[in-house]
Curated annotation (Swiss-Prot):
A Gene Ontology molecular function term of the record: rRNA binding
Domain of life: Bacteria
Protein name per UniProt: Small ribosomal subunit protein uS11
GO cellular component: ribonucleoprotein complex; ribosome
The family this protein is said to belong to: Belongs to the universal ribosomal protein uS11 family.
Role description: Located on the platform of the 30S subunit, it bridges several disparate RNA helices of the 16S rRNA. Forms part of the Shine-Dalgarno cleft in the 70S ribosome.
Xref: SUPFAM superfamilies: Translational machinery components
Transmembrane segments: none
Keyword Membrane: no
Keywords from the UniProt entry: Ribonucleoprotein, Ribosomal protein, RNA-binding, rRNA-binding
Subunit (UniProt): Part of the 30S ribosomal subunit. Interacts with proteins S7 and S18. Binds to IF-3.
Pfam families: Ribosomal_S11
Amino acid sequence: MARQPTKKTGPKKQKKNVPNGVAYIQSTFNNTIVTIADLNGEVISWASAGSSGFKGAKKGTPFAAQTAAESAARRANDQGMRQVQVMVSGPGAGRETAIRALQGAGLEITLIRDITPIPHNGCRPPKRRRV
């Protein structure tokens, strides 16, 4: 009978005490990714609709964005985060829902900024859907 391989454990993640930071919400038509970082840009926690257990077209829904934001906010709360500035990017359905979920999870929102990149007539957009 073969021996079971032993699991190597790396260094444990230390609990930081970071009172305020920045929450980046990247909301596309297919997914929503919420990343919470400290003011230096070091990532404290992140979650996406896919990592929260949604698959396929359900990842693009507002409920999936809410679940992802709650998950990221809970982990940031464990690290001691209380206040966040919110940077929202992208055209997706989960933008406002994710912001409300961050607020509901106990994070105080001090600023909301839309950082969606807008082309000055750059690449040609995809053709319109005909359903």
